[in-house]
Every structure is written in structure tokens, then in C-alpha cells.
């Protein structure tokens, strides 16, 4: 049984763009580097050749990984979701009960999670604590520094 990979339409598009970049730009550039390095003669001691081959291996591995994730993607259009209950795709505004600091997180698939962009994986401890909860509820999450409590201030679908 093939395990589906949940992701937003934005996450799917980002993976598609990376795949196109790697296939149509990076792959030909690397092949060119290999050909150029090969022309320098003895391959056994040709560091440039070995570096280009290693780069090719890395690129081809990532292409295979991207193709696999895209093939197994379960794309969820977040804009068509609604409701007060937090689930995949929700954008949640939290208030730290200790510091009163507001943070906004969107719950996304593992492949598109990026804390710097405010996107957390559905498998993260925070997302798992939020799933199924509603606005106004308080959740407690085990963090590296101990338990943290957050009030759910807002649930949006965007």
C-alpha cells in the first residue's frame, strides 16, 4: 500500500518547481561539468571529475525523492476548508500564556514544513496538540524547555 503524503497546493507547486529546476537546469549543467572534467585526462586523480559525479549523484537522488513525493502527494486545497476545528491546513494564531507573545502557524505536510515561514509539520508535537481543538481552547505542549501552554486565539483557512 502506497502511503500518501499530505501537502497543500502551495507545497506541491514548490516541489514541482524544484523538480523542474533540477531536471532542466541543474542536470544539464552537471553533465557539462562532467564532460569538461573528463576532457582533462586521467579520471583516477581528477578531483573536478569526482566532484561533478558526486554532485550528479546528489541531484539524481533528490530528483527521485521529489518524483516519489509528488507521485504520492495528497494535495489538499486549504482555501476550500472551513470550520472552527483545527485540522491539516489550518492557520492558527496562538498566544503563549507565559509571555503573551502571539505566533501564527500553518499546519502543513512534513515535506513543506518550515518554521521560518510559519509552517509546522502535521507530525510535530505542537500540531498534534492543536489538531481537533477549537478557538479559545488552551493547549499544553511539551517543549525542550518544559511544558508550554498556548491559547488558541484564531483559526483561519487561507
Curated annotation (Swiss-Prot):
Function, in words: Necessary for efficient RNA polymerase transcription elongation past template-encoded arresting sites. The arresting sites in DNA have the property of trapping a certain fraction of elongating RNA polymerases that pass through, resulting in locked ternary complexes. Cleavage of the nascent transcript by cleavage factors such as GreA or GreB allows the resumption of elongation from the new 3'terminus. GreA releases sequences of 2 to 3 nucleotides.
One Pfam family, short name: GreA_GreB
Annotated InterPro entries: GreA/GreB_C_sf, TF_GreA/GreB_CS, Tscrpt_elong_fac_GreA, Tscrpt_elong_fac_GreA/B, Tscrpt_elong_fac_GreA/B_C, Tscrpt_elong_fac_GreA/B_fam, Tscrpt_elong_fac_GreA/B_N, Tscrpt_elong_fac_GreA/B_N_sf
Keywords of this entry: Coiled coil, DNA-binding, Transcription, Transcription regulation
Keyword Translocase annotated: no
Organism field: Bradyrhizobium sp. (strain BTAi1 / ATCC BAA-1182)
Family named by the database record: Belongs to the GreA/GreB family.
MF GO annotations: DNA binding; RNA polymerase binding
Domain of life: Bacteria
Name of the featured protein: Transcription elongation factor GreA
Ranges in a coiled coil: 47-74
GO biological process: DNA-templated transcription elongation; regulation of DNA-templated transcription elongation
Amino acid at each position: 500500500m502506497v502511503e500518501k503524503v499530505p501537502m497543500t497546493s502551495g507545497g506541491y507547486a514548490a516541489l514541482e518547481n524544484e523538480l523542474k529546476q533540477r531536471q532542466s537546469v541543474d542536470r544539464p549543467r552537471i553533465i557539462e561539468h562532467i564532460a569538461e572534467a573528463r576532457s582533462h585526462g586521467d579520471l583516477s586523480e581528477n578531483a573536478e571529475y569526482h566532484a561533478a559525479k558526486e554532485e550528479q549523484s546528489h541531484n539524481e537522488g533528490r530528483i527521485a525523492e521529489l518524483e516519489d513525493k509528488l507521485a504520492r502527494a495528497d494535495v489538499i486545497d486549504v482555501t476550500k476548508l472551513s470550520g472552527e476545528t483545527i485540522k491539516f491546513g489550518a492557520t492558527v494564531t496562538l498566544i503563549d500564556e507565559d509571555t503573551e507573545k502571539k505566533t501564527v502557524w500553518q499546519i502543513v505536510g512534513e515535506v513543506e514544513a518550515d518554521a521560518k515561514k510559519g509552517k509546522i509539520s502535521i507530525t510535530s508535537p505542537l500540531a498534534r496538540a492543536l489538531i481537533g481543538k477549537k478557538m479559545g481552547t488552551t493547549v499544553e505542549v511539551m517543549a525542550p524547555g518544559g511544558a508550554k501552554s498556548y491559547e488558541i486565539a484564531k483559526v483561519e483557512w487561507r
